[in-house]
Regions:
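Basic, flexible linker segments flanking DNA-binding modules
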Residues: 1-50, 148-149, 206-210, 215, ...
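Acidic/histidine-rich, metal-coordinating catalytic segments
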Residues: 97, 108-126, 145-147, 198-203
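C-terminal domain-tail junction helix/linker
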Residues: 128, 135-139, 160-249
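Active-site beta-loop-alpha junctions of metal-dependent nucleic acid enzymes
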Residues: 60, 64, 83-109
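RNase H-like polynucleotidyl transferase catalytic core
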Residues: 30, 114-121, 135-154, 168-174
Length: 249
């Protein structure tokens, strides 16, 4: 879809696949990715309705393990906020949630418009401090069933992709790891097209640009197909040179 957006010309995914396959550029995956989730029973229909939060572990050579706290919008898959922590406490969760509310402007809206929070049953997520903070913010807290990680499939999958990418290189300082995480989040939010989002980026969906982009892509596709038909008709309308010479003789 980036080719369509940048070159203003439509090429189907099937055509791209055939070309890559012919050049032996389609490789088998190094591992089979297991789906992290089925479908959430109460699906979101717009951004800022439900936020998923979770921790994951990342190692810094010579420093030990650090904890990455992430807040992800359920509908758009947009990473709203993240924070690298040396601990995994309730205060680390709220320290990530605070900028998530501010960045979206949700700290200024009425309570009934606040997003719900979906988390697992980790110690930091069932702590009384977090419950008090959520109550003060007017946010509803939903916790997944124990030993049922697929409830948070989107954020679990995002963390796994991040670790697969980042663990290819060692980080020797917290600042270096933060730079890697920042680059990954920037790529996933603003550059990577998600098939589940109609080949839009998370930012396109989160900030409401998706419908306009899809409409423009549809227009480009119609224009491209019309041009191809005209070119085909023009080519078939011209007599073959050998046949033309035979007719003249």
């Amino acid at each position: 879809m980036r080719f369509t957006d940048e070159q203003r010309y439509f090429v189907s995914e099937a055509s791209v696949y055939r070309l890559l396959k012919a050049q032996d550029l389609i490789t088998s995956p190094a591992c089979i990715v297991v789906k992290a989730a089925d479908e959430f029973t109460d699906k979101t229909t717009a951004p800022n309705q439900l936020r998923q939060t979770d921790f994951t572990y990342l190692k810094i050579a010579g420093w030990g393990w650090y904890h990455l706290s992430t807040v992800l919008d359920d509908f758009s898959r947009f990473v709203v906020a993240w924070r690298l922590c040396s601990t995994m406490k309730a205060e680390d969760v709220t320290a990530t949630l605070n900028p998530a509310l501010t960045a979206s402007g949700l700290d200024r809206v009425r309570v009934r418009h606040r997003p719900r929070l979906l988390s697992d049953n980790g110690a930091s997520c069932i702590a009384g401090e977090l419950a008090e903070w959520l109550e003060d913010q007017g946010m509803t807290h939903i916790r997944g069933a124990p030993r049922h990680p697929r409830t948070q499939g989107k954020i679990e999958r995002r963390h796994q992709t991040l670790k697969n990418r980042i663990l290819l290189e060692h980080s020797y300082l917290p600042g270096a790891l933060e730079e890697q995480v920042s680059a990954f989040v920037e790529h996933c939010n603003h550059r990577r097209a998600h098939e589940s989002l109609g080949n839009l980026t998370a930012a396109d969906v989160h900030f409401g640009r998706g419908e306009a982009i899809l409409a423009e892509r549809a227009r480009i596709k119609r224009k491209t197909l019309t041009q191809r038909r005209l070119q085909h008709h023009a080519a078939t309308a011209q007599p073959h040179p050998q046949m033309d010479q035979t007719l003249r003789s």
